[in-house]
Amino acid sequence: MATQGTKRSYEQMETDGERQNATEIRASVGKMISGIGRFYIQMCTELKLSDYEGRLIQNSLTIERMVLSAFDERRNKYLEEHPSAGKDPKKTGGPIYRRVDGKWMRELILYDKEEIRRIWRHANNGDDATAGLTHMMIWHSNLNDATYQRTRALVRTGMDPRMCSLMQGSTLPRRSGAAGAAVKGVGTMVMELIRMIKRGINDRNFWRGENGRRTRIAYERMCNILKGKFQTAAQRAMVDQVRESRNPGNAEVEDLIFLARSALILRGSVAHKSCLPACVYGPAVASGYDFEREGYSLVGIDPFRLLQNSQVYSLIRPNENPAHKSQLVWMACHSAAFEDLRVSSFIRGTKVVPRGKLSTRGVQIASNENMETMESSTLELRSRYWAIRTKSGGNTNQQRASAGQISIQPTFSVQRNLPFDRSTIMAAFTGNTEGRTSDMRTEIIRLMESARPEDVSFQGRGVFELSDEKAASPIVPSFDMSNEGSYFFGDNAEEYDN
């Protein structure tokens, strides 16, 4: 975690960089992207995929997953020490889809992890290129965020399913480093901490001995990451209390749930990055585009530009709507699962609808699904405008919000009111201000009550024409605030299952 005074931008976290200037950052992010692209090209050659098959998002996901699994040291070690029936710890693979005689066929492939690591390193000038691996993890995480609701996980940790807007990055592995920590929502950090505390309550030895010491360090580090996301002194002080606790237990769980609730109004700073599938980077590199020389940013115009000029295909099940599948992937590409739908619609230039109204299931195809009836179609991932991604939660104010999701987490730095349903949120805060954190709780509640409806967030920030790469002329959109803005509104999205 960067200490005070050495705040690094996401791009620096993304590329493990020390302090760099803007040009160096753009170059190192570009280098990371071209490494992913070169790796993807090589894998398509190895697998003898046609151009169309190489641009199929399902094939991209399998290839990305293979390299992530090949580099998952802890799991590899675990698999070697606990051999399970029918699983070769040295191999990795998945489904590859090919077009044969006018039909889609599924082929299960298996590769040596060592071989995949060799191809990856070769594509990345001999480096392990951890930044590129993390980038792919964040893309998978963003896809999960747009596809699934985490209701069950929220309920299991004692949180409210309506707090889903705080759950960005909830499926990111712990090993995703600083870049991963930056994109995790407040709810995600709270959930990780609660799980840890609950294990400590049930297992007497959890905090003891050499292992316990390591656990404690991890606990405090996670608290520090959470603290860094809060923007008010009272919230930060309360995280300090949780971190300093001698023997974390139910009181800390209560405090953490309180903090998570407060983040619905007093929003945390959560980074947003546009991470695209490898099948976008591959063809761009193959066409001769030099990412490292041109430079690249995950939070500017570059991903929008890249998507304007990319062809990506997806398998479509018999009763799915290709336009809806496109929306799902568009949201994932821009990490916009918890953004206000009005803002997303304006930028995309087509209406973005709530999850429950989408006629599409996830992008991945289960191994038992019938391939006979599978079609494929082009994903429409282009946009009308572009906007800078945000790393702050914006300031807070009150608007009508929905029954399913009662707050949003902004993705795009665009002037607007940030909707939340104050009465619903505040109802959860009645009477519970006793105990050692009482003064902080009182202060946080006061701050929440005084959050004003008229406050406009991201003052003067707008969207930009795709021809305006220097972001010179912002267009500040006006939004109809009487409409519904939440994606998971009164929703029936599938649950995420590990």
UniProtKB/Swiss-Prot annotation:
Localization (cell): Virion; Host nucleus
List UniProt keywords, sorted A-Z: Capsid protein, Helical capsid protein, Host nucleus, Host-virus interaction, Ribonucleoprotein, RNA-binding, Viral nucleoprotein, Viral penetration into host nucleus, Virion, Virus entry into host cell
Q: How is it modified after translation?
A: Late in virus-infected cells, may be cleaved from a 56-kDa protein to a 53-kDa protein by a cellular caspase. This cleavage might be a marker for the onset of apoptosis in infected cells or have a specific function in virus host interaction.
One term of GO molecular function: RNA binding
Tell whether Ribonucleoprotein is among the UniProt keywords: yes
GO terms in the biological process aspect are:
symbiont entry into host cell; viral penetration into host nucleus
* Sequence motif: Bipartite nuclear localization signal, positions: 198-216
Q: Which Pfam families match?
A: Flu_NP (PF00506)
Motif annotated as Unconventional nuclear localization signal, chain positions: 1-18
For the keyword RNA-binding, the answer is yes
A GO CC annotation given for this chain:
ribonucleoprotein complex
Disordered as annotated region, ranges = 1-22
Q: Where is the composition biased (Basic and acidic residues)?
A: 8-21
Regarding protein family, the annotation reads: Belongs to the influenza viruses nucleoprotein family.
The subunit structure is: Homomultimerizes to form the nucleocapsid. May bind host exportin-1/XPO1. Binds to viral genomic RNA. Protein-RNA contacts are mediated by a combination of electrostatic interactions between positively charged residues and the phosphate backbone and planar interactions between aromatic side chains and bases.
Q: What does this protein do?
A: Encapsidates the negative strand viral RNA, protecting it from nucleases. The encapsidated genomic RNA is termed the ribonucleoprotein (RNP) and serves as template for transcription and replication. The RNP needs to be localized in the host nucleus to start an infectious cycle, but is too large to diffuse through the nuclear pore complex. NP comprises at least 2 nuclear localization signals that are responsible for the active RNP import into the nucleus through cellular importin alpha/beta pathway.
Would you tell me the protein name for this molecule?
Nucleoprotein
Biological source species: Influenza A virus (strain A/Swine/Cambridge/1/1935 H1N1)
